[in-house]
Amino acid sequence: MSYVAAEPGVLISPTDDLQSPRSAPAAHDENADGITGGTRDDSAPNSRFQLGRRIPEATAQEGFLVRPFTQQCQIIHTEGDHAVIGVSPGNSYFSRQRLRDLGLWGLTNFDRVDFVYTDVHVAESYEALGDSAIEARRKAVKNIRGVRAKITTTVNELDPAGARLCVRPMSEFQSNEAYRELHADLLTRLKDDEDLRAVCQDLVRRFLSTKVGPRQGATATQEQVCMDYICAEAPLFLDTPAILGVPSSLNCYHQSLPLAEMLYARGSGLRASRNQGHAIVTPDGSPAE
C-alpha cells in the first residue's frame, strides 16, 4: 500500500477535540453522524500528535464552505481529480436537496465524484444499542434503502450517464483488492500501534457515551461493533486513490474525521497516502461542525 509516514514539514495537522474529552452533544437522529463523524476544536492543543504551523482558510464554493484539513489537502482540492462524499444512513443532514447541492458542488470542482454510503455493520450497530435483531434489521434496511434512493435520484438527475458522478455502497469495496489489503493491515496495526488503538478506542467511547447511559456503561459487544464500523470506513480515509484508481482524492464530510489528526500528523505511524486528502464541507455561512 502507498500510505506512508509523513515527511517532516509535508503534512500539517490542526487539532480537533479527540484528545480533549468533553461532554458529547446529544444525537439528533438514529445514526447521528455515524461513528466516524466527529467535531473539531482548534482551541485545545493535542499532545499525542505534532501540530503544523498553518491551517488553510475555508473557501466558499457553490453554496458551501470548504475547509481542507492540511495544506497538502488544499493542493489535492485544487487539483480536483476526485472527491468522495461520505453519506451516513438515518442522518437527517443528508436531505434530498442537500445531496443534490453536494453533487453540483462536486461536479463543478472535480473530474469525478463518488457518493459513498454506509451499508455495513448498520444492523449490528442498532442491535448492539438495544434493538431486537428483527427491529435492527428493519431499521437498517429502511435507512439504507432511503439514503440509496436519494443519492440515486441525484446521480440520475445530474449525470444520467454516470460518467463523472457515481453512487457506491461501502459493501462494494469488500471485493476490492486494495481495500482488502488496507483493511487487513489496519486490523494488524490495531494490535501493535498504541496511537491507533488509543484513537480508535477514544472514538468508540465518545460515540457510545451519546448512546449509552453513564450508569449502564458500554458492553464489550457494543465496543466491538463500533470498532468494526470504524475499520470498515477507514481505508477510504487512508488511500482512496489506490482503491478507485484515481490520481488523488479528497474525502469530504460535514464534520472533521476524528481519525484525521493522526492520519495527517507529522512523524511515523499510520498516515494517509500523500495523494489522499480530507476536507470539511458545510453549507455556506455555517461553522465546521
UniProtKB/Swiss-Prot annotation:
General function of this protein: Involved in the biosynthesis of mycocyclosin. It uses activated amino acids in the form of aminoacyl-tRNAs (aa-tRNAs) as substrates to catalyze the ATP-independent formation of cyclodipeptides which are intermediates in diketopiperazine (DKP) biosynthetic pathways. Catalyzes the formation of cyclo(L-Tyr-L-Tyr) (cYY) from L-tyrosyl-tRNA(Tyr). Can incorporate various nonpolar residues, such as L-phenylalanine, L-leucine, L-tyrosine and L-methionine, and to a much lesser extent L-alanine, into cyclodipeptides. Cyclodipeptides synthesized by Rv2275 always contain L-tyrosine.
Q: Where is this region: Disordered?
A: 1-48
Per the UniProt record, one Pfam family is CDPS
Report which reactions are catalysed by this protein.
2 L-tyrosyl-tRNA(Tyr) = cyclo(L-tyrosyl-L-tyrosyl) + 2 tRNA(Tyr)
Q: Which organism is it from?
A: Mycobacterium tuberculosis (strain ATCC 25618 / H37Rv)
GO terms (molecular function) for this protein are: aminoacyltransferase activity; ligase activity, forming carbon-oxygen bonds
**Keywords on this record?**
Transferase
Q: Which family does it belong to?
A: Belongs to the CDPS family.
Please identify the protein, giving its name as recorded: Cyclo(L-tyrosyl-L-tyrosyl) synthase
Oligomeric form and interacting partners:
Homodimer.
Give any extra note attached to this record. The reaction proceeds following a ping-pong mechanism forming a covalent intermediate between an active site Ser-88 and the L-phenylalanine residue.
- The entry's active site is 88
Q: Which residues bind substrate?
A: 91, 229-233, 253
Q: Annotated site (Could be involved in aa-tRNA binding), which positions?
A: 139, 229
Q: Which domain of life is it from?
A: Bacteria
Q: What class of enzyme is it?
A: transferase
